[in-house]
Amino acid sequence: MTKKIDSKELPPFEYPQGYQLFAGVDEVGRGPLVGAVVTAAVILDPNNPIEGLTDSKKLTEKKRDLLFPEIQEKALAWSLGRCEAHEIDELNILQATMVAMQRAIAGLKVTPDFALIDGNKVPELPMAGLAVVKGDLRVQEISAASILAKVTRDREMEVLDKEFPQYGFAKHKGYPTKAHFAAIEEHGVISEHRRSFKPVKRVLGIE
């Protein structure tokens, strides 16, 4: 059984010395069978702090929705990036995530000196970068990015749900749940489904 890591057990993050502007970068949507992988990059303003930043998955939907506009308003810069389902199929999910992160950073109106990436892999960037394991719990910039990315993708799934209510996207957000599998088996796949993912391949008979 995997032990859940409490943020209090994690070592405090030490920011690399000699840099001024840090961008936090995170992604949402690597696991779902449908839709884009969405990324965000955020440079926070030390003179305009935001209370309550943490991993977006640890916050209620209501709290995320409250923080979403506050981050956009108070950050020095923020940007969203994405790779669509067809790009994920062409590249693979890891490479597509790296590209989406590159797009988020490239979209920042202020150029950061250093990029802090949640996870264990840094995409090729024009500035220094560091992968931070559990960064969404340890680094406020990454926490802010995780909230922007999650709220954005969740809202996209709610829009898709209105177009295709039979799939239940608003509930499971495209993740591989029993309800999602059952809907695919009954109704087939839509253009937003990731055809390179095994459960989708199975329904299409292209395993």
UniProtKB/Swiss-Prot annotation:
One of its GO terms (cellular component) is ribonuclease H2 complex. The keyword Hydrolase applies. One of its GO terms (biological process) is mismatch repair. PROSITE patterns: RNASE_H_2. It is found in: Cytoplasm. Gene3D superfamilies: Ribonuclease H-like superfamily/Ribonuclease H. Its EC number is 3.1.26.4. GO terms for molecular function: manganese ion binding; RNA binding; RNA-DNA hybrid ribonuclease activity. Its main location: cytoplasm. Keywords: Cytoplasm, Endonuclease, Hydrolase, Manganese, Metal-binding, Nuclease. CDD domains: RNase_HII_bacteria_HII_like (cd07182). Residues 20-207 form the RNase H type-2 domain. Pfam families: RNase_HII. Manganese or magnesium. Binds 1 divalent metal ion per monomer in the absence of substrate. May bind a second metal ion after substrate binding. It catalyses: Endonucleolytic cleavage to 5'-phosphomonoester. Coiled coil: none annotated. Its cofactor is Mn(2+); Mg(2+). It comes from the Bacteria. The keyword Nuclease applies. A divalent metal cation binds at D26, E27, D118. It is an enzyme of class 3 (hydrolase). HAMAP family: RNase_HII_B. Endonuclease that specifically degrades the RNA of RNA-DNA hybrids. Belongs to the RNase HII family. PANTHER family: RIBONUCLEASE H2 SUBUNIT A, RIBONUCLEASE HII. This is Ribonuclease HII. It comes from Aliivibrio salmonicida (strain LFI1238) (Vibrio salmonicida (strain LFI1238)).
